[in-house]
Curated annotation (Swiss-Prot):
Name of protein: S-adenosylmethionine synthase
Function description: Catalyzes the formation of S-adenosylmethionine (AdoMet) from methionine and ATP. The overall synthetic reaction is composed of two sequential steps, AdoMet formation and the subsequent tripolyphosphate hydrolysis which occurs prior to release of AdoMet from the enzyme.
Organism listed in the record: Shewanella amazonensis (strain ATCC BAA-1098 / SB2B)
Ranges where the record places region Flexible loop: 99-109
Lineage, top ranks: Bacteria, Pseudomonadati, Pseudomonadota, Gammaproteobacteria, Alteromonadales
GO CC entries: cytoplasm
Ligand binding (ATP): H15, D164, A165, K166, R230, F231, D239, R245, K246, A262, K266
Amino acid sequence: MAKHLFTSESVSEGHPDKIADQISDAVLDAILEQDPKARVACETYVKTGMVMVGGEITTSAWVDIEELTRKTVREIGYVHSDMGFDADSCAVLSAIGKQSPDINQGVDRADPREQGAGDQGLMFGYASNETDVLMPAPITYAHALVKRQSEVRKDGTLSWLRPDAKSQVTFAYDEGKIVGIDAIVLSTQHCDSVSQSDLVEGVMETIIKPVVPAQWLNKDTKFFINPTGRFVIGGPMGDCGLTGRKIIVDTYGGMARHGGGAFSGKDPSKVDRSAAYAARYVAKNIVAAGLADRCEIQVSYAIGVAEPTSISIETFGTGKLPEDKLIALVRQHFDLRPYGLTEMLNLARPIYQATAAYGHFGRNEFPWEQTNKAEALRADSGL
């Protein structure tokens, strides 16, 4: 592999699509807190002055969807009509139905260990040793930039910031190793009164420099800070938002393949979510065990069937074992049936709203980021 560039982007919690994701996961968490066996598929749409929450939910729990929605929007920071969106005055509409009994009969079993997958589908997990969290660097630093934007907005360091923001980071690689950063883009919503020069200086000194390692910056690194020159109208006033539209931001920033299924608003019986988390867990433990420098795993499922219909692994020439041997180790050490992966990662609990902004992976507070299988994988590998 010769020299090449690779780019990933992220968006802040105030981006319209991320508002929708966070509302969907806030509803999911509130339900799981009361009913861990609930079936939830919650979708959200946001636009100027309104939120619509819909989907299919089967549960014994009762939650106040309107209050959950307003609380989530308020915590993000949309608290005044001059932002085009106000937690206290926006309309909240609800269109919730129940999960189809045709799906239930394929999922529920007398023996929960034989629980079938809630749908067909394919999921990917990925890990790389290029960062300490075993994630690709471009998405890791893209997330870090918009997370820092949120921090300095909320603590008042840059009081003219508003909730909506986007980042993009282009890394330069040589023979697969990072040699620097070629470009950084950061666009942030702001109040009308701040000058472009103050904004550029504030973003550079307060957001970019504290986040990006200086050794990756050089005289040729390009910075694009609010390159249009103005970003006052943002959030749902600028664009409508929908749950599940940021699936590449949520995962690996394009560095790995994606099966197409979104995460937010889905309970763990939906393998779109739970199997993608388990696949990350597997890939991360393989890399942590030193069995590969990079690892991508694919799993697939059929609706109503417990066992995965396929498992495949790609190590991009970095594997220390043949891939069929790695797959055998995965089958030995990980239960990838829907019930098994829910139990393995303790997923039937309210942990999801925190995942809905700044990435689902590379954050050690989540159970699928543990590397507690690495030692056993290494021991059984024969290396």
